[in-house]
Amino acid sequence: TTTTYDRHFTTTQPHYRQDDRSRYDQQTHSQSTSRTLAIIALLPVGGILLGLAALTFIGTLIGLALATPLFVIFSPIIVPAVLTIGLAVTGFLASGTFGLTGLSSLSYLFNMVRQTAGSVPESLDYVKGTLQDAGEYAGQKTKDFGQKIQSTAHEMGDQGQVGVHAQVGGGKEGRKSGDRT
């Protein structure tokens, strides 16, 4: 019989089949084998490159030791020439950098405008429709107001009221309607 401890211990442990364990062992073995082969292959390459770097460094030091007297002798000619060439190269590099920066900026702006060009007509159509609706609304309100003024004028004309002219021509000073001085 199994105890509570045995049941708990056996149910909480992961269940592996024998095939899963052997597959895991094979993967681990193949990974370590591939790492070993990579180290064996790259060790000579790294050693050769390190040796070439050392030879290049030693050659540079020997060349500098041999060329130093020539630099001292020809320094009145070499220094201005090196400065001139250095400044020219710096100018060309700066010019190229500014040109590439300008081209990339223009390219960015062109792409941004091209992407927004699809949404601009929709926005323009919306604004155009809104302005047209506002114009129609203002026209209708103007027409209604004109009709209201016309009907009010007819009503006043029918009743014989003359006070309208006094209100238009008069003011706070108490001028008469016909007096324009």
Curated annotation (Swiss-Prot):
BP-aspect Gene Ontology terms: post-embryonic development; reproductive structure development
Comp. bias (Low complexity): 158-167
Keywords from the UniProt entry: Lipid droplet, Membrane, Transmembrane, Transmembrane helix
Region (Disordered): 1-28, 155-181
Protein localization: Lipid droplet; Membrane
Protein purpose: May have a structural role to stabilize the lipid body during desiccation of the seed by preventing coalescence of the oil. Probably interacts with both lipid and phospholipid moieties of lipid bodies. May also provide recognition signals for specific lipase anchorage in lipolysis during seedling growth.
Source organism, top-level taxon: Eukaryota
Chain intervals for the UniProt region annotation (Hydrophobic): 39-110
Membrane-spanning residues: 38-58, 69-89, 90-110
Topology class, membrane: Multi-pass membrane protein
Pfam families listed in its UniProt record: Oleosin
Record-level GO cellular component terms: membrane; monolayer-surrounded lipid storage body
Family membership noted in the UniProt record: Belongs to the oleosin family.
Record region (Polar): 1-38
InterPro entries the record matches: Oleosin
Name this protein carries in UniProt: Oleosin
